[in-house]
Amino acid sequence: MSMQRLCYVLDLHDDAALIAQYERWHRPSEVWPEVVASLQQAGIAELEIFRSGDRLVMLMTVGEDYDPAAKAARDAGDPRIQAWEALMWRFQKALPGSAPGEKWREAGRIFALSEAVSVQQGSAA
């Protein structure tokens, strides 16, 4: 199965205590089982969140069956996922310029080392 990596960005409120709480909620033992199950059922093979200051970067590896609209629709009807989202929104804030209600914003890839190597090796031949 072909896999694809996606990258999303979001900010946290710039408050050390809130950021510490957010990180605690994301310990492997603290993320609600329903959240983990929802991610897996959606075709997400791996999901990692990185933080620099109050900026979050989420990397997702998804299979061909991943459909973000279908996942959003399922999540909208799941009270437990909605409760998790409401809890997380206490810590999160939208990026400047985000649409109303938009949380994680997709980032487009602008460089891939493997592609540069392929192009440069191809032009050297």
Curated annotation (Swiss-Prot):
<keyword id="KW-0413">Isomerase</keyword>
<comment type="similarity">
    <text>Belongs to the RbsD / FucU family. FucU mutarotase subfamily.</text>
</comment>
<dbReference type="GO" id="GO:0036373">
    <property type="term" value="F:L-fucose mutarotase activity"/>
</dbReference>
<feature type="active site" description="Proton donor">
    <location>
        <position position="13"/>
    </location>
</feature>
<comment type="function">
    <text>Plays a role in the catabolism of L-fucose. Involved in the anomeric conversion of L-fucose.</text>
</comment>
<dbReference type="Pfam" id="PF05336">
    <property type="entry name" value="rhaM"/>
</dbReference>
<dbReference type="InterPro" id="IPR011008">
    <property type="entry name" value="Dimeric_a/b-barrel"/>
</dbReference>
<protein>
    <recommendedName>
        <fullName>L-fucose mutarotase</fullName>
        <ecNumber>5.1.3.29</ecNumber>
    </recommendedName>
</protein>
<dbReference type="InterPro" id="IPR008000">
    <property type="entry name" value="Rham/fucose_mutarotase"/>
</dbReference>
<dbReference type="InterPro" id="IPR052996">
    <property type="entry name" value="Carb_Metab_Mutarotase"/>
</dbReference>
